[in-house]
Regions:
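A membrane-interface helix-boundary motif in multi-pass transporters
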Residues: 75-77, 165-185, 372-392
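Helix-to-loop junctions at the C-terminal end of transmembrane segments
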Residues: 61-77, 165, 274-287, 372
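Cytoplasmic membrane-interface "Motif A"-like loop-to-helix N-cap segments
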Residues: 70-85, 145, 172-173, 284-296, ...
Length: 435
């Protein structure tokens, strides 16, 4: 029996279209879930749990990722089913604002957990599948371009959503949130359709790729990849001490309107769009590790900037810095995983990476929710004390772990200062490397 020919070009086209609709959904679900929770009456601790519990259970679910792929019969079949389930759960969120019940926040949390678990199971399958299509030498440039393009859709989604909520202010915020999450559900259904049009390359099994989580952890001293995972988990823990609460600080403490909130989110997303291809080209040139070290240091400083001023114009600059820094972190970290792990081990290693990272995120969010209501005020606000603690922890993990792992492929040498000057355009490395 002849194996079906895999059309890589058509699969990448379908994946790109999936990314467009997924990005539209993400612009709503990732940036307006906390505003919805606050609208439904959530406390600071509940906001922390809304961020923490979905990520924890999503990460734990990834222990089952490899088994579920085998049980369903392939990565692609699993992806389609999970995406359609996600769309259905998002549709349920759309009706929550209309329900007259005391458990609306708890219902939102439960639905977000189900959505996150579906996403957690889908992550390793998608990462393994998409990297089968693209050679390692082109991944930085490709994902930089792809992320920038779908990021533009996320940006548009954030803007449209903010304008919708602002315009519904005199009508009904319940109707506004219903419209937003109903649109997100429809976009996710469309995303599932385009995933179903992709082809699945043959996936060869390797006995060496069958290793347990404990076997994975036990190789800390020998494994360069595991030391990277520990660094990433430390940075994630420190980041999520404060990350879920910036929206709370803006909407509850500073009393910003949804329009101002939207504008600040747009600044971050726009900076990320501009920076992604720059980081991608430099990652291909000097390696993902150098890009990750620089961008994670820049990201570590972000909470400290919130202590200086709360003027919206100033915070726009802070958000631009944040979007620039985090785009480098996410792109280089993902590409390092793809470079450091063989295709046969990729699903399992991505799953274990997400398990550890998800546990760190849960601990950070849960502890942040507790500390946010317990720490003494700093400059008049309790959450500013939490931001200061987060900054201190970010820098601490950076100094302890950023140099514990190394690049896995040949690259051009460059210092951190040379890389920074090149990324911002002062003294480009890319032009010199081609001379």
């Amino acid at each position: 029996m002849r194996r079906k020919r895999v059309d890589v070009r058509e699969s990448l086209r379908s994946s790109f279209k999936d990314g467009i609709f997924a990005a539209f959904m993400a612009g709503i679900t990732e940036h307006y879930a906390t505003p919805l929770a606050l609208f439904l009456g959530a406390t600071v601790q509940q906001v922390g749990l809304i961020s923490a519990l979905p990520h924890l259970l999503a990460s734990v679910s990834q222990f089952l990722a490899v088994r579920v792929i085998h049980w369903i019969g392939g990565r692609l079949k699993l992806l389609v089913r999970l995406v359609l389930c996600q769309a259905s759960f998002i549709l349920c969120i759309a009706i929550l604002p209309w329900l007259d019940t005391a458990q609306r926040v708890e219902s939102l949390t439960a639905l977000l957990i189900l959505i996150a678990v579906c996403g957690g199971l889908a992550g390793p399958a998608w990462g393994s599948l998409i990297t089968d299509y693209i050679p390692s030498s082109k991944r930085g440039r490709y994902f930089g371009w792809r992320n920038r393009t779908v990021g533009a859709v996320t940006l548009a989604s954030i803007i449209i959503s903010g304008l919708v909520l602002y315009s519904f202010g005199e009508i009904s915020y319940s109707a506004g949130f219903c419209l937003l999450f109903g649109s997100a559900a429809l976009a996710r259904f469309a995303s599932g359709y385009f995933i179903s049009r992709m082809d699945e390359p043959p996936h060869r099994s390797d006995p060496a790729s069958d290793f347990t989580f404990l076997m994975f952890i036990a190789r800390f001293r020998q494994s360069n990849f595991l030391r990277f995972v520990v660094f990433s988990a430390g940075l994630t823990f420190a980041t999520y001490l404060s990350a879920p609460f910036f929206a709370v600080f803006m909407l509850r403490d500073l009393q910003f309107s949804y329009l101002t909130y939207m504008g600040l989110q747009v600044c971050s997303s726009f900076a990320s769009l501009v920076a992604l291809p720059l980081w991608g080209r430099h990652a291909d040139l000097v390696g993902n590790v150098r890009v990750l070290r620089l961008s994670s240091f820049l990201a570590a400083l972000i909470p400290a900037f919130w202590l200086i001023s709360h003027d919206p114009a100033y915070l726009m600059l802070v958000q631009i810095w944040g979007g620039f820094a985090w785009s480098g972190v996410t792109l280089s970290a993902a590409n390092f995983i793809y470079d450091a792990v063989t295709p046969q081990k990729r699903v399992r290693c991505i799953a274990y990476f997400n398990v550890i990272n998800g546990a760190a995120l849960f601990l950070g969010s849960a502890l942040g929710g507790f500390l946010g209501s317990q720490l003494p005020p700093l400059l008049g606000y309790g959450l500013l004390s939490l931001f200061a603690v987060s900054c201190f922890c970010r820098l601490g993990f950076y100094l302890l772990l950023a140099r514990s792992f190394r690049e896995v492929r040949p690259t051009q040498k460059a210092s951190t200062r040379e890389l920074l000057f090149s990324v911002v355009g002062i003294r480009p490395l890319i032009g010199r490397s081609q001379e």
